[in-house]
């Protein structure tokens, strides 16, 4: 699952996404939020989708014992010598599960001097 999530996360960063949306019904649908709009990325069969969802819940310390309770979590993710802070929201439903990952620092670092040069 690590490699699969790394691929998804890398593609989200390349697309300048602020959020990654995962919705598991009879299949897993993944969408990226780019400039406020949801853009479809990939779909997976239900068994693979359930594994991805469980991986994300585990990484973000979401309690799997509370299946019908909305929860939040977070984790750090290292990619290409950069650490990303990810906030995770989990929303269960009667016939679906949804996870949204907010990428909190997906921009380049700007120094004070660089800010003062911006007109």
Question: Where do the model's predicted regions map?
Answer:
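N-terminal "pre-motor" subdomain/linker immediately upstream of P-loop NTPase catalytic cores
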Residues: 1-119
């Amino acid at each position: 699952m690590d490699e699969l999530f790394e691929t998804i996360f890398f593609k989200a960063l390349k697309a300048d996404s602020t959020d990654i949306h995962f919705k598991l019904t009879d299949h897993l649908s993944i969408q990226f939020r780019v400039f406020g709009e949801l853009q479809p990325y990939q779909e997976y069969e239900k068994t693979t989708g359930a594994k991805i969802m469980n991986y994300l819940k585990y990484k973000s310390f979401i309690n799997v014992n509370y299946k019908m309770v909305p929860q939040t979590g977070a984790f750090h993710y290292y990619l290409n010598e950069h650490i990303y802070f990810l906030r995770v929201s989990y929303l269960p439903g009667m016939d679906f599960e949804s996870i949204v990952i907010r990428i909190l620092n997906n921009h380049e670092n700007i120094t004070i001097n660089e800010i003062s040069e911006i007109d």
